[in-house]
């Protein structure tokens, strides 16, 4: 199962996808390369991320 998160910034709106079984520190990158983020926490009984690392970057 994969899940998708959508982040919005001043410059771009982009989806991040991840496997529900992914490592808590799994590195994620969107399909266009616009931005990237690192997962900091995955919930045990939910299908969405509860937290994303502050390292989110956009051009």
Swiss-Prot record:
InterPro entries: Circovirus2_Orf4. Keywords: Host cytoplasm, Host-virus interaction, Modulation of host cell apoptosis by virus. The keyword Transcription does not apply. GO terms for cellular component: host cell cytoplasm. Its main location: host cell. It is found in: Host cytoplasm. One of its GO terms (biological process) is symbiont-mediated activation of host apoptosis. Coiled coil: none annotated. It comes from the Viruses. Antagonizes host cell apoptosis by interacting with host ferritin heavy chain. The ORF4 protein physically binds host FHC, resulting in the reduction of FHC protein levels in host cells. Reduction of FHC concentration further inhibits the accumulation of reactive oxygen in host cells, leading to reduced apoptosis. Interacts with host FTH1. May interact with host ANT3. This is Anti-apoptotic ORF4 protein. It comes from Porcine circovirus 2 (PCV2). The lineage of its organism: Viruses, Monodnaviria, Shotokuvirae, Cressdnaviricota, Arfiviricetes.
